[in-house]
């Protein structure tokens, strides 16, 4: 009888304690809602946390806590809370959709795919195919990326990023013509993205279409793309390839001020002058290459060609012969009357 009394008493105490805990959890939950509605998110978070400590299985409280963390841009912590909510209710639509979005923003690409597939099963949310396309692209699965781009464009044909992802996927598979078409479609929808413009220029260069390559590389610079040495060198190449030699040479000379002993730059300027039949200038720049590297057979050979073009045949032939001694493969160029590089 005494044991029964102890059990009953203990049971009543546990029940009372549970009820008190539940009441306290509800109290802090309601206070959290009030603070959140007043946009005092830090105070709301404190109350939702107290409620969570008292009742970890309260799904509504967990969702409010996660939402409050998101309002404070604390996405990793919010994602952790949504994961706890997922354990309680794996098919909760709000939980699944937010986990997909947070995983996307945090570049957790495999998780994005998993949650988007769940979104599709639950038939919720929008833009699922775009999220899949981007995730597969980042995972370097370009075939799947393009497949989902084709699906995504049916849902939102005005989303420029869809065409950009498709373009990058084709580019990374070296299908430059398809890539170029996608870049053009992306830029038709977003005419402000200088990075896309620059990449479009590089893709058109690879096609090759020299005029379109120059157009987009120039446009990128006009729209604010950083004019790094790499950008300027590609701009110079685009000018030269498009036959605008004066502009190309001018850009190369500007770069040379920053990289005064760059042999490739010096060689390229000499090559550009040679193509415009300015042979003394070409000789001057190839001579600078040889000062830096007297074993550069290509520069020596081209000096010889330039001397021949300007009428000093004997000296030119002598230099070409010396270059061929240094690099016998140049003999074939003489026979074909080509420049090094097949030009």
Residue ranges and their predicted role:
Residues 2, 17-76, 80, 87, ...:
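N-terminal leader/linker segments that initiate helical-solenoid repeat arrays
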Residues 24-26, 241-243, 301, 305-343:
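Terminal, low-structured helical/coil segments at or just beyond the last alpha-helical repeat
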Residues 27, 61, 95, 128-129, ...:
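TPR alpha-solenoid repeat register
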Residues 30, 64-67, 71, 98-101, ...:
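Canonical tetratricopeptide repeat
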Residues 37-38, 71-72, 105-106, 138-139, ...:
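Register position in tetratricopeptide repeats
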Residues 54, 88, 121-123, 155, ...:
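Structural marker of alpha-solenoid helical repeat scaffolds
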């Amino acid at each position: 009888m005494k044991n029964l009394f102890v059990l009953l008493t203990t049971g009543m105490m546990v029940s009372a304690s549970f009820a008190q805990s539940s009441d306290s959890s509800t109290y802090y939950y309601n206070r959290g809602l009030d603070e959140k509605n007043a946009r005092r998110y830090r105070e709301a978070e404190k109350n939702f946390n107290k409620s969570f400590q008292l009742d970890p299985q309260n799904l509504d409280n967990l969702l409010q806590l996660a939402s409050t963390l998101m309002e404070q841009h604390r996405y990793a912590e919010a994602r952790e809370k949504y994961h706890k909510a997922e354990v309680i209710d794996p098919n909760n639509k709000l939980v699944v959709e937010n986990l997909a979005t947070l995983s996307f923003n945090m570049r957790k690409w495999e998780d994005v795919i998993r949650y988007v597939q769940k979104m599709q099963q639950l038939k919720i949310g929008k833009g699922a195919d775009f999220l899949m396309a981007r995730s597969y692209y980042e995972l370097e699965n370009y075939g799947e990326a393009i497949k989902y781009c084709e699906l995504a464009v049916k849902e939102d044909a005005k989303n420029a990023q869809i065409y950009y992802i498709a373009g990058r996927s084709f580019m990374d598979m070296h299908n430059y013509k398809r890539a170029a078409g996608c870049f053009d479609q992306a830029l038709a929808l977003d005419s402000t993205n200088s990075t896309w413009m620059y990449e479009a220029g590089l893709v058109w260069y690879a096609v090759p279409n020299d005029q379109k390559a120059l157009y987009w590389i120039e446009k990128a610079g006009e729209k604010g793309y950083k004019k790094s040495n790499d950008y300027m060198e590609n701009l110079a190449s685009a000018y030269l390839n498009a036959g605008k030699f004066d502009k190309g040479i001018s850009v190369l000379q500007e770069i040379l001020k920053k990289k005064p002993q760059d042999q490739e730059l010096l060689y390229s300027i000499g090559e550009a002058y040679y193509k415009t039949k300015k042979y003394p200038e070409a000789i001057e720049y190839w001579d600078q290459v040889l000062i830096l590297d007297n074993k550069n057979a290509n520069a020596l050979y081209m000096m010889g060609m330039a001397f021949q073009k300007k009428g000093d045949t004997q000296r030119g032939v002598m230099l070409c012969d010396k270059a061929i001694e240094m690099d016998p493969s140049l003999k074939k160029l003489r026979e074909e009357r080509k420049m090094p590089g097949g030009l």
